[in-house]
Amino acid sequence: GSSGLISMPRV
């Protein structure tokens, strides 16, 4: 994912 306000899963 990404480090920030929102977390996006690595797919």
UniProtKB/Swiss-Prot annotation:
GO terms for biological process: neuropeptide signaling pathway. The keyword Ribosomal protein does not apply. Its main location: secreted. Expressed in abdominal perisympathetic organs and abdominal ganglia. Transmembrane segments: none annotated. Keywords: Amidation, Neuropeptide, Secreted. InterPro entries: Periviscerokinin. The keyword Zinc-finger does not apply. The modification Valine amide is found at residue 11. GO terms for cellular component: extracellular region. Mediates visceral muscle contractile activity (myotropic activity). Belongs to the periviscerokinin family. This is Periviscerokinin-2. It comes from Blaberus giganteus (Giant cockroach).
